[in-house]
Regions:
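Short acidic, glycine-rich surface-loop motifs adjacent to enzyme active sites
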Residues: 58-82, 100
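Catalytic-core regions built around general acid/base machinery
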Residues: 81-97, 112
């Protein structure tokens, strides 16, 4: 199941989405094993997207979700009111949003959509359960989850894992927990 806001087939071309999906709901190592996943691709292979493409993905989720639904946004943007408005509209339609808190070591309240009060915004901890030096922080972080050396499906292999770092990997742990809670 995939929607590609870039007009492609939804395939992951760098492994980020594969890792995120595997952490949230992978059949072997996922938090919510077996939960239904829809790939909503908003980043090209270069890794840099546009706000309009991200908005297209959020709007697609809003229009096509089946409740209960969780949208994991392992992405971030500088404060963008138009993105915040789209996510708020999606939340009102019944989608729970989990967002990566950011990897800049700064105030998470400067990032969209994680700064929204109804978004579960996730920072990253290390092996000692301490906030990493690079994880964003502040009153807009809802909670922390492991974000260092997180084992996730390896994009280049059907049988091995790769270790990932970042709030992008912490967020799907929380998304998986929310899926278990909501029984998605």
């Amino acid at each position: 199941f995939a929607y590609d806001a870039l007009g492609g087939d939804g395939s992951d071309c760098n492994g980020h989405g594969t890792g995120v999906a595997g952490i949230a709901a992978g059949s072997v190592h996922g938090v919510a094993k077996g939960a239904t996943i829809w790939s909503v691709r908003v980043f090209p292979c270069s890794g840099t997207s546009t706000l309009s493409t991200i908005l297209a993905g959020v709007d697609w989720v809003t229009a096509h979700h089946k409740s209960p639904a969780i949208a994991n946004l392992s992405l971030g943007a500088a404060a963008a009111p138009i993105l915040d408005t789209a996510v708020e509209r999606s939340i009102r339609s019944g989608v729970t949003y989990v967002s990566a808190g950011g990897n800049n070591g700064g105030d998470a309240c400067a990032m969209s959509p994680g700064k929204l009060k109804d978004v579960i915004n996730v920072g990253a901890t290390d092996a000692t359960d301490s906030r990493t030096s690079w994880s964003n922080y502040g009153s807009c972080i809802s909670m922390f989850a492991p974000g260092v050396n997180v084992a996730a499906p390896d994009y280049y292999s059907d049988v091995s894992l790769a270790n990932w770092n970042g709030t992008s990997m912490a967020a799907p742990m929380v998304s998986g927990a929310v899926a278990l809670y909501l029984q998605v």
